[in-house]
């Protein structure tokens, strides 16, 4: 006669069909903010079950309740093992875990921008094809400008974000699914049907007509009394962002402080939230009550009130934080031992009036050294920056972005010199490769510390032929070609040293006091168009040897007052055509020796008044 589970305390529902797998026993655990795990010991008359029919597929257990209803344990079959059988039966062991556990099997590098943590969590779930979750959050959460999943599983990424924000979860089990419930407060919890209160019966009490607890333990542990956090905002460099939160306790040594930096916030209100949730997470461990008994309907996330205990202060409402189960069913074949207790549960509970928060156990990924990235921006732009000289980049590991102005947050750029409205600035341009470091190794906090050349963005001078050359060479924007640039270049080749300066258009030099030029040999200066020189005070010019001035067309020289010319030896002046001299007043001309005047043609002399000529000797004309 085929075996059946119709009359059993626990019914197995598997992809293999009715009564193919039967439960011998189960050990399981659940915890707020952690994954559940149910280990099923199963038996079957089929000794050759193909694991592919089970692995990765949903299974459930239906546990009969005293009221006639059922409680379900639903999960994904994540591992299967065949055991040595007994008689006509084969043994199997199957582990059930939540769908959330499957996120431990996938990892990514991904950037989220301008989203709250609940929005990020839901997007991760949906992108991976999961929809069995429920938002029971009551708090509001800040928008993260920039949040990175970096070389970590999607489970770790979501878990650490929840732990940071003080969000946790538990699972609601149904026959055909289990639902992840996001929680952050008392209002996210409720009582199980028929288990709003559960009595305590001492072990020696004989009449136990309903589900109950028979063992009670209370534990307390010294915790830190306060937590202070701090951070820095470059937009408010002098602002104090330190925050503090405390949970006072009456016992000795209950006030030891914790301090941490950075707190990963820019607004004090966000810091206060983080400080409060972290100290609440610590004090979630302060007091625990452990109850053992037979409360088949209670699991992690349920509320209930304990009744009947001899300490009145302990008859209060509790929140189940951890639940451990042990189920044993009677043997399907004679000769196998039966256990007296078909169901036992052990619950770790806390006072429901106290806030529960998950401890931050999931490690933050660390970027272990600098990376390179490519500067990006909108189509049609060559330089894309904001008022602080920040730029955006595409990381080589990011397979989701479009390499545009939305690829990253604005990232600060290290410069050679940075003062208050003074210093050096060279903005990385779109397409250039930059070196990116991360503050404290945090992928959420990038900073550009350098730039490098690559095969597309090559060096400005041909190497290694010009290895002795160094300098700076820019590129005109927009749409500048290799012929459009400003440049300062130094040639250090022995015997051919040179400092070369090229201005693509204008060059303006301002000297607020003295300027001195020294040229050890020749100087050549060519101006392709006009030159204007203005000296607002005196000008002295000295030529120790010859001076030659050649003027191709006209020359006009104007002296506002006196002009004095002293010639140490001879002077020769030649006018190729006419010369006109106009003297507004008197003229005195003195020749210390002879004067010869030769007029090849006519001469006209007109004296408007008297003329006096005194000749000491002869005169020949």
Predicted feature residues:
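Short alpha-helix capping/helix-loop boundary micro-motifs
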Residues: 39-49, 283-294, 360, 417-423
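A generic structural signal for residues embedded in beta-strands
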Residues: 61-63, 306, 433-436
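Short, solvent-exposed secondary-structure boundary/capping segments
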Residues: 81-96, 326-347, 383-388, 456-465
């Amino acid at each position: 006669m085929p075996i059946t589970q119709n009359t059993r305390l626990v019914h197995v529902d598997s992809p293999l069909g009715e009564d193919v797998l039967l439960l011998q026993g189960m050990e399981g655990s659940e915890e707020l903010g952690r994954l559940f795990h149910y280990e099923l010991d199963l038996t079957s008359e089929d000794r050759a079950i193909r694991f592919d029919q089970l692995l990765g597929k949903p299974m459930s257990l239906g546990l009969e309740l005293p009221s006639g209803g059922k409680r379900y344990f639903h999960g994904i079959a994540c591992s299967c093992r065949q055991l040595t059988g007994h008689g006509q039966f084969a043994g199997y062991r199957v582990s059930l875990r939540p769908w959330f556990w499957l996120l431990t099997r996938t990892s990514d590098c991904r950037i989220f921008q301008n989203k709250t943590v609940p929005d990020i969590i839901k997007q991760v779930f949906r992108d991976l094809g999961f929809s069995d979750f429920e938002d029971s959050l009551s708090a509001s959460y800040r928008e993260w400008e920039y949040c990175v999943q970096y070389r970590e599983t999607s489970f770790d990424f979501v878990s650490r974000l929840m732990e940071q924000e003080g969000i946790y979860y538990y699972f609601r089990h149904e026959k055909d699914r289990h639902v992840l419930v996001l929680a952050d407060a008392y209002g996210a919890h409720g009582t199980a049907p028929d288990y709003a209160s559960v009595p305590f019966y001492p072990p020696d009490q004989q009449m136990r007509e309903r589900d109950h607890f028979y063992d009670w333990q209370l534990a307390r542990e010294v915790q830190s009394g306060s937590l202070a956090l701090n951070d820095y905002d470059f937009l408010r460099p002098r602002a104090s962002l330190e925050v503090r939160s405390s949970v006072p306790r009456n016992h000795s040594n209950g006030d030891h402080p914790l301090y941490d930096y950075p707190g990963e916030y820019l607004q004090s209100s966000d810091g206060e939230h983080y400080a409060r949730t972290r100290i609440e997470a610590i004090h979630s461990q302060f007091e625990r009550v452990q109850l053992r008994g037979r409360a088949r309907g209670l699991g992690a996330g349920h509320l209930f009130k304990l009744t009947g205990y001899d300490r009145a202060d302990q008859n209060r409402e509790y929140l189940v934080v951890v639940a451990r189960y042990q189920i044993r069913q009677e043997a399907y074949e004679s000769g196998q031992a039966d256990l007296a207790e078909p169901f036992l549960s052990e619950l770790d509970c806390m006072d429901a009036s106290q806030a529960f928060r998950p401890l931050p156990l999931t490690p933050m990924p660390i970027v272990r050294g600098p990376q390179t990235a490519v500067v990006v921006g909108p189509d049609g732009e060559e330089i894309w920056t904001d008022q602080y000289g920040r730029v955006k980049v595409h990381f080589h590991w990011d397979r989701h972005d479009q390499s545009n102005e939305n690829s990253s947050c604005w990232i600060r750029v290290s410069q050679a010199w940075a003062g208050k409205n003074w210093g050096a600035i060279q903005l990385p341009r779109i397409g250039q490769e930059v070196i990116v470091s991360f503050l404290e190794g945090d992928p959420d906090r990038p900073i550009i510390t350098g730039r490098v050349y690559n095969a597309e963005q090559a060096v400005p001078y041909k190497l290694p032929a010009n290895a002795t050359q160094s300098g700076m060479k820019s590129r005109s924007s927009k749409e500048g070609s290799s012929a459009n640039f400003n440049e300062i270049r130094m040639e250090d080749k022995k015997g051919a040293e040179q400092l070369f300066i090229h201005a693509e258009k204008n060059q303006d030099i301002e000297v607020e006091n003295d300027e001195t030029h020294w040229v050890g040999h020749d100087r050549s200066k060519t101006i392709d168009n006009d030159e204007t020189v203005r000296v607002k005070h005196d000008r002295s010019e000295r030529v120790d040897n010859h001076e030659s001035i050649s003027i191709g067309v006209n020359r006009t020289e104007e002296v506002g007052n006196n002009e004095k010319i002293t010639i140490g030896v001879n002077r020769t002046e030649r006018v190729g055509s006419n010369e006109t001299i106009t003297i507004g007043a008197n003229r005195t001309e003195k020749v210390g020796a002879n004067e010869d005047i030769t007029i090849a043609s006519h001469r006209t002399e007109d004296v408007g008044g008297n003329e006096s000529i005194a000749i000491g000797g002869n005169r020949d004309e």
